[in-house]
Amino acid sequence: MKKDTIAAISTGMTNSGIGIVRISGEEAFAIIDRIYKGKEQLSQAESHTIHYGFIKDREETIDEVLVSVMRAPRTFTGEDTVEINCHGGTFVVRKVLETVIKNGARPAEPGEFTKRAFLNGKMDLSQAEAVIDVITSQNEYALRSSMSQLKGSVKRKIEEMRKEILYHTAFIETALDDPEHISVDGYGETLQTVTEGILIELEDLIRSSDDGRILKEGIQTVIVGKPNAGKSSLLNVL
């Protein structure tokens, strides 16, 4: 995994009240120290604090900002992170990003912040996938499903099954190594019950995945009927 420091605009590229430029990586604090002018040096600031000041490119003042300082590992990516809250005009946000890149960061690739969060153990694959699902949710049900996955509902189920499998695998291996002291009488029935239970849970997960896809993508439906049969009324109800 690359250890360089990345930066990107975290808000939409339209004129708005506020724009955010995020920096993540080992050099995040060194970079912000080069371009931020305020009451204190942000590399010395406490984690999870916000500071008022200005972003400067040499002697030129770019914008008046609030800067959030977050130290690893208690961040989204698991790395040192800085978020620059500036005015949301597209030009000024891009100018702030250009200044950050000029001072040592590189432009983040699409999805790279989430990728780093995954690689640094801040989330598992199901949660990483849920991030984009939350962003692209088109209805309340899809959002609720995606948020549940992001909060770890799928992860917990998989982890419980994994623990169950590891427990019984360890028991079987121990029994094979020491058959004189470990009895396996009746264990076959227990193992069968456990295995069947895990298979049912896996089938439920697969089924819920299919249901989730319908919630997120919807169902293509055609309403067909004779003229004045009530097709429009039915569509309006739906």
Spans of features found by a protein language model:
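Long, non-coiled-coil amphipathic alpha-helical linker/lever segments
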Residues: K122-E201, L205
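Conserved G1/Walker A P-loop phosphate-binding module
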Residues: N15, R22-S24, R34-K39, F171-L238
